[in-house]
Amino acid sequence: MPVAKVQAVENRKSFRTKTLRLHPLENRTFDQACEALNDMERTQLMQEAVIQEAARLGVRWTVEPAAPLTSVWPYLPQRGDEPTQVRVSITVSLPVAEIITRAAEHVHASEPMFIIGATLAHIGRLKACFKGIHADTPEEARDIRAALDRIKLPPQYQYPRRGRRRR
């Protein structure tokens, strides 16, 4: 009998797979961002994005629910009539999967649309604010920022650049 119990535990998964249907522009944008960030894996980029956006919205591990939105979530992708052409899957941990579900419900979006919108917004923030202070060299940081700058985003995901600090 103990063998059956051990076997049941071994079959449990610590992750969930999320399938996304992307427009070619979204797919290209995600590829460019991953390449700019020293070939970061797409799943990692998207997990960072959804965690950051969920926290920004107040969706986090707490007993208090997030305050209701006072306006429409601005990062919901505007798809129009153009059909999606690219299907991708990402793998997320169980806690991240739960955060995605809670955040998507909070903004009244499907989980895939929340993931896509949060990731596009994250790329916009990286373009505007990423400094590369942990890059191996100043040249590498400059290359990463330049590659991020070349990414074209729809207007709703563009952020004003922060000015340089004056000393």
Task: List the predicted regions and their residue ranges.
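Arg/Lys-rich, low-complexity, intrinsically disordered N-terminal tails that contact nucleic acids
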Residues: 1-13
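Σ70-family region 2.3-2.4 aromatic/basic alpha-helix that recognizes the −10 promoter
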Residues: 19, 47-48, 89
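The DNA-recognition helices of helix-turn-helix-type DNA-binding domains
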Residues: 37, 52-53, 57, 121-122
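Short, positively charged interaction helices/loops
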Residues: 55-91, 95-98, 102, 124-167
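Short glycine-enriched loop/turn motifs at secondary-structure junctions
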Residues: 11-15, 81-84
